[in-house]
Swiss-Prot record:
Membrane topology: Multi-pass membrane protein
Transmembrane segments: 42-62, 79-99, 105-125, 197-217, 224-244, 296-316, 321-341, 366-386, 393-413
Record-stated family: Belongs to the CDP-alcohol phosphatidyltransferase class-I family.
Keyword set includes RNA-binding: no
GO annotations of cellular component type: endoplasmic reticulum membrane
Keywords, ordered alphabetically: Endoplasmic reticulum, Lipid biosynthesis, Lipid metabolism, Membrane, Phospholipid biosynthesis, Phospholipid metabolism, Transferase, Transmembrane, Transmembrane helix
Biological classification of the source: Eukaryota, Viridiplantae, Streptophyta, Embryophyta, Tracheophyta
Name of the gene: PSS1
InterPro entries: PSS
Protein name as annotated: CDP-diacylglycerol--serine O-phosphatidyltransferase 1
Source organism: Oryza sativa subsp. japonica (Rice)
Length: 425
């Protein structure tokens, strides 16, 4: 964080360097009012955590723990195990490129991602029925088969004989929970990716994914006006527009991040405090997909991973019997959003890095690992649930697209290679 303000000379503290990024610059750059939050107090917090564990576990009072039933003891033990790991991540996990609102927050997100990765690994070794029943431990309403709603049973816009309303089909879809989810989701993606052409590729690409897998999931069976007009041209467009407006608004302003103690009045102090929860930099990410064949493949890989994560939401919901309004769906989406924020920044930094030998950041690695495990869960638990095969015309269409893409990349690579040979001669 860059802070402008006068301060007394202090002993310089060099923060840990992780993936080539300095986690904390030095204490001299931190405002005096908030400098305490950047000083390491790992031993003190360890002693406080130990005292809490002694109280919660009844280590000094074994008779009290005997009165608790076995199921409750196991639940408490699992939650305590997760809490200890998250506390360790909060204090000692590797820092990322993000420094707002505090590097420790993103270390905590790193720990939550590892916990989610381990939980997915555990589920992968269960049967489908056992996994469905295990979900009851996470939410009591789960473990029950659910009816899957289809949005394309009646695609008429005007229904003259409907008892409620002649436009009832439109009203039902307009007031569906997925409308708000579309807008908020694309607003969040626009803030993360900050590149409008790439966002539109993802928007249209996901609608093509819905068309591709509509024979497997009734939820993807939508009317043409729902998919094209409502989803792409209204909800997705509004979310992308609002997100890019947010980025341009903050990107076009000049900031002097004066410390909290130097703000002139209460209103300024409140604004500065709220500003701590916004990104330090709002500059738009440049991906340059047409820089070369390899860069094109790298950006295309990002789009593919994005769409796989989106598809995993619906397939996991279908396979594990999780209703759309269950809070677990929201928790997973919020966790993925928190993971994706540093992942996008790390991946963009990785693409822009000119070093001959480089590696992706820890969040990039975790995101890819979680995506793969979710996909494996969908494949394993979805076995036998989708009796309908893909229509032949759809298979031919995607095969043609893949073949044309391969030919395009080969011709592009050959032209670049031929140009390099001519320059050497």
């Amino acid at each position: 964080m860059e802070v402008n303000g006068h301060h007394k000379p202090r002993r310089e503290y060099n923060g840990r360097e992780c993936n080539g990024v300095q986690s904390v610059n030095n204490f001299g750059d931190i405002d005096p009012w908030t400098a305490w939050a950047y000083k390491p107090r790992t031993v003190s917090l360890l002693l406080m955590g130990t005292c809490f564990l002694i109280w919660a576990s009844g280590a000094l009072d074994p008779e009290r723990s005997f009165s608790v039933d076995r199921v409750s003891s196991v639940k408490r033990g699992v939650f305590a195990m997760i809490a200890v790991f998250l506390a360790y991540s909060f204090l000692q996990a590797p820092s990322t490129v993000l420094i707002r609102p505090h590097p420790a927050i993103w270390r905590l997100v790193h720990g939550m991602a590892v916990v989610y990765l381990v939980a997915l690994t555990f589920l992968l070794f269960q049967t489908r029925d056992d996994a469905r029943q295990f979900m009851k431990y996470l939410h009591p309403d789960l473990g029950v088969e659910l009816p899957e709603r289809s949005y394309g049973t009646d695609c008429r816009i005007y229904v003259p004989d409907h008892p409620k309303s002649r436009f009832n089909n439109v009203y039902e879809i307009l007031f569906d929970e997925f409308v708000i989810a579309h807008i908020l989701g694309w607003w969040g993606k626009a803030i993360m990716i900050r590149n409008q052409p790439l966002l539109w590729v993802l928007s249209i690409g996901f609608e093509l994914m819905e068309l591709t897998f509509r024979h497997m999931l009734p939820n993807f069976n939508e009317c043409w006006w729902d998919s094209i007009v409502l989803d792409i041209l209204i909800c997705n467009w509004f979310g992308i527009w609002a997100g890019m407006k947010t980025v341009r608004y903050f990107d076009g302003r000049t900031y002097e991040w004066v410390g909290l103690s130097r703000q002139p009045n209460i209103i300024s102090k409140v604004k500065r405090t709220l500003g701590q929860f916004t990104p330090a930099q709002w500059d738009k990410d440049e991906w340059y997909p047409l820089l070369g064949p390899w860069r094109f493949i790298q950006v295309l890989s990002l789009c593919i991973v994005f769409m796989i994560v989106e598809l995993n939401t619906f397939f996991l919901k279908f396979c594990l019997w999780i209703p759309p309004r269950n809070p677990l769906i929201v928790y997973r989406l919020v966790l993925w959003w928190l993971i994706a924020i540093p992942t996008i920044r790390e991946y963009n930094t990785y693409l822009q890095d000119r070093k001959p030998v480089k590696k992706v950041g820890s969040f990039c690695w975790l995101s890819l690992a979680i995506c793969i495990l979710e996909l494996l869960l969908c494949i394993k638990f979805g076995h036998g649930l989708f009796p309908k095969s893909m229509p032949s015309w759809l298979f031919i269409a995607w095969t043609t697209v893949a073949s044309l893409l391969m030919m395009f990349l080969l011709v592009w690579t050959w032209k670049i290679y031929r140009t390099m040979i001519r320059k050497r001669l």
